[in-house]
UniProtKB/Swiss-Prot annotation:
Designated gene of the protein: GLG1
Site-annotated residues for Important for catalytic activity: 104
Residues binding UDP: 10, 16, 95, 120, 122, 247, 250, 253
Transmembrane intervals: none
Induction profile: Induced during the diauxic transition.
The protein's name: Glycogenin-1
Native organism taxonomy: Eukaryota, Fungi, Dikarya, Ascomycota, Saccharomycotina
Amino acid sequence: MYKKLAIATLLYSADYLPGVFALGHQVNKLLEEAGKKGDIETCLIVTTSLFNGTLSELAKNILQSIYTKIVLVEPLNCQEESIQKNSENLALLERPELSFALIKARLWELTQFEQVLYLDSDTLPLNKEFLKLFDIMSKQTTSQVGAIADIGWPDMFNSGVMMLIPDADTASVLQNYIFENTSIDGSDQGILNQFFNQNCCTDELVKDSFSREWVQLSFTYNVTIPNLGYQSSPAMNYFKPSIKLIHFIGKHKPWSLWSQKNFIKNEYHDQWNEVYEEFKEEHQLNNEVSKPKISDSDKTETPETITPVDAPPSNEPTTNQEIDTISTVEENVDNQNAEPVPNSDHSPAPNPVPLDFTKWLTTFINKDHLTNQPVNESREYSKENDNNIINSSSNRDQESPPNSTQELNSSYSVVSTQADSDEHQNAEEEDSTTDNASNSGEESHLDDISTAASSNNNVSNQPDGKNFSNSKENNISVESSPSNPEQKRSTDNIQKPSVSTNDLPDDVEPHTSVDDNIQYLEKDKEGYEEFLPDVYESNAIDNEEEFFDDDARDATEGETKTSAVADKQEDMKLTAEETNQPQQEMPNFKFDWEDSDYLSKVERCFPDDIFEYAVE
């Protein structure tokens, strides 16, 4: 085993500063746990312009307390040309910031160390077992690189975790190779594979004599976790006890603002947050620094200057800085108000509860054309919806079996004919005075029937113009109604659907909702449907007794009994026929509403405060 060992990481953008803090804190903790705190150094490689021009004094002091050695480096001499050359391949990754990762070639210049374990700043060692890599690669040569297969293409290695031997000659050859060749992915991983990985050699003759070698290590030393939640669950469960290190690949990191809101949380994401909270407690930053809000937007960063940068006259951040993640207490007051500091018990912050429960309830409903509707229009939608329901019920009533209604009409017409003939005979026997009285009683009784029909129409919910009665039903004689109460009830039921809009007040429209009809009935306290037949039947019978003598009444009662028996038999036949007829199936509302525009309006039926009780 080599004597001078180091664990190094790279900081080329302030966006990765939280990852550098958490990684350095965790590595020091595990080194102390393994008893190798003095045997293995921690090293941070950072660009000179970033360290002197962007980071604050507080950030610099913290970095110097975490890492035993900080190495300032300049961009590669060929970096501008390499960025332009690799721009097309880099665009495929949609990761423009990776163009600066070519500075990772500077790792082989760390000749002050004999062996280096490189870790990306978005990695998190889980336990001290990751230090076994030094034992596994104890006989490594300068032409070898120890790395783990990439999850995207296993014939290539992931450059986030690498074991390497610093060497000046290798560093020089590598930098020239970067200048002369185009990276597969436009970034450091592609070009390092082309340089060290024998699998990337397309020429079979050259492949056999390839001078450099990739030593493949176990995947448990670099378990890549994409932030979209994709992973091989069975393998993760099986090898979970053996995992030594987690790598948060992708553009969204655990500390980024997008991840804090949208990331599919898992135990490793929570573990990173716990480590970061421990780091803040150790450095007493809970009252000074809130959780950093790193923007996830893809920014086209300008290449850093190649010329060496002298020490600036002051350490204040420049005006062209990308982001000042950690600053003084006064600069972070707004950050504290913007996002609360997590609890000191290291428990992960709970997911925010959506306050707009109406939007949450109708997540699968297309509401685009209703989002900008005013409140009064939403009420109109509610009324239209109620009218649609009323119209549908009236249509169903109208579509009732026509045979039954026709047969009833025919039977009632026969009864009317018989009653008219009896009336004609009685009229010849009576004198003119009796005829006049009879006519006056007839008119009064027709008024009663008209009043009852109008009252029943107020109770019904049928729309205008839906008159189901024919001319024969409207011409029913006076004698047929009082002589047979059951016949009168049936006649009233047939006349009931007819609507008389003249009885409604002027301020009530015919096409109103059910609530308006109920309010109107409350104003008119008389005329309930179930009591109407008894009222006008009793009055009609009293009037009849005044105008008919005993002989005429006996004859009429005989005819009435005969007609009543015939009517009962006819009703029994109708009931049997209705029983034999197939019952009309009601529409399946569970599926019919999918074809209508009901869903576009249903959200407006919910009051805005319906879910307020659930919000604390």
